Amino acid sequence: MIVDYEKDPRAKEAIAIWEKGVLKEKDGSMSDAINFYRSALKIHDNVESLYRKKILDEWMLHKKLSGLSMTTDAPDEQNETGKDDLSVEENAELQPCWILEILPDDILLRIIKKVILMSGESWVNLSMTCSTFSKLCFHDSVPFKTFAKYIYSKQIYDKMAMDLNGITDINTFEKEIWRGDDYRMLRERPYIKFEGVYISVVNYVRYGSNAESSLSLLKPVHMITYYRYFRFYENGQCLRLLSTDEPSAVVKHFSKENKPRHSHMCYWSLGFDYDFGHLKITRSDEKYTFIEEFQIKNQGNKRYQRLKWLSSIVVDKEGNASNCSLRNEKSFFFSRVKSFKDPG
């Protein structure tokens, strides 16, 4: 049922209170604004929609009046140039804020492109605000093209893997495989995420032994918990840490500028095996080279959120390789960290 807010006293009262909340929000007084919004909702539960309709009606009226004024001749030069501040204020009050009616789709798509470059999460959040943005965000090719160009330009591919597959240029390769279908490429081509940390939580049980003087038949049981952390950088570096410290104590300051004790700086690259989801992480010291390999996989509906172990190899200076046991190891899961957003 459509309510005529001009004839319904409750609707008019609720809109008036809602407008006070809008003014408070513009001034930065969010607590006062929320109080006004709550009061308005108690009077009329559909007040936000009525307020938006009122704004739209005012804008449409303004457009009609502007069209009429353009078709009438100016009485004289004095009236043309003698508009006082009141007219300016009236025009300012009628400025549009109903962007979905006022702005064409190409402008809205430019806004969406800017949002995508902020973060993929912001893109999803914007799409959920209304049906118009949902349609433009996920039923138009521009957003997918923007995100694909943004994220895949940051991926680093192993030079040897490219040579073995006869690939000289990754951009040419992706055009041959996906033929400009960015939506399909995003669904089929895994990528590394940079604005967060990949964390693996490992729990296992270790059985202890009784003291020599103990008469107990039961052996003590120890629950061992440790964490592995990866943070990837766009220049091919990767910060690695094995620690018993929980994420709440590690993640906030986990960076190559402030390296935690016992952390290592590694190098990462992608290969083309495992449906383009082959990840290799390497590091070296004076005696050994360590190679850890993973497959990038989905976590439920979240794409490319998980790193599944494939192998962990240690190679000495003579070239002798040893495989490390993965019996207790668990997959890594990506956790977004807002402060890791590249300011550039």
UniProtKB/Swiss-Prot annotation:
A GO BP entry: SCF-dependent proteasomal ubiquitin-dependent protein catabolic process
Keywords: TPR repeat, Ubl conjugation pathway
An example Gene Ontology CC term for this record: SCF ubiquitin ligase complex
A Pfam cross-reference name: FBO_C
TPR repeat ranges, renumbered to this chain: 14-47
Presence of keyword Transmembrane: no
UniProt pathway annotation: Protein modification; protein ubiquitination
Tree of life domain: Eukaryota
Subunit structure: Interacts with SKP1. Component of the probable SCF(HRT3) complex containing CDC53, SKP1, RBX1 and HRT3.
Role, per record: Substrate recognition component of a SCF (SKP1-CUL1-F-box protein) E3 ubiquitin-protein ligase complex which mediates the ubiquitination and subsequent proteasomal degradation of target proteins. Probably recognizes and binds to phosphorylated target proteins.
The protein's name in its UniProt record: F-box protein HRT3
Organism taxonomic ancestry: Eukaryota, Fungi, Dikarya, Ascomycota, Saccharomycotina
